[in-house]
């Protein structure tokens, strides 16, 4: 399916997968309204401030996006984060609340606000994670949030069945973005260690998966795409090259 002339809304668009997807959508002729807290880093046709954890910010974002675009053909729910890698007993409610409000409440909120404006033939894409398919140690809040996103995508597809709106989740493993920097409080040494000794997936490669789903024929729904580095079989199992 051709994307030229379509309208897209993208969250979490200031870096990484979000920024790469915005770029590739625009290269395909899509007009993109994109948002992030660091709006100065967003490069889209319409760049808007957005905090998905804040109802007023989210409402203003969607209203402005729809006013500029006139309707939505593609929604990419990409905003999300993880904080820390500690056993659950060492986690705090503040950290858990931040992760769940961003990754779960924010996704539901943006979807609810956008859905009335999604046109026939539209497509809603969720940025999931292999953490939403199989747990690993010391990541309870993030894992719970991504299982929730996967469950919501299933439920939304059931609710939209019979309407010409497709729903896809892209579940990624290790992708070299600012994700690990955020997770470890901008500790570059800890973040770099996540990707040491292997070739991680790149943001462009995940964006390619998003566009692959979007460009299938309208009668085809790719429910899920799982993308991982060759060296990773699950969230907890990674084979690294010997640094020696």
Tell me the role of every PLM-derived stretch.
Residues 129:
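Residue(s) in the substrate-gating loop at a strand-loop-helix junction
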Residues 7, 14-15:
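Conserved glycine-rich cofactor-binding loop
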Residues 50-60, 93:
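The beta1-alpha1 cofactor-binding region of Rossmann-like NAD(H)/NADP(H)-dependent oxidoreductases
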Residues 116, 158-161:
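Alpha-helical segment proximal to the catalytic Tyr-Lys
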Residues 86-88, 95-98:
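Substrate-binding pocket helix/loop in short-chain dehydrogenase/reductase
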Residues 111, 145:
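Active-site helix of classical SDR
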Residues 169-170, 188-236:
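C-terminal helical subdomain
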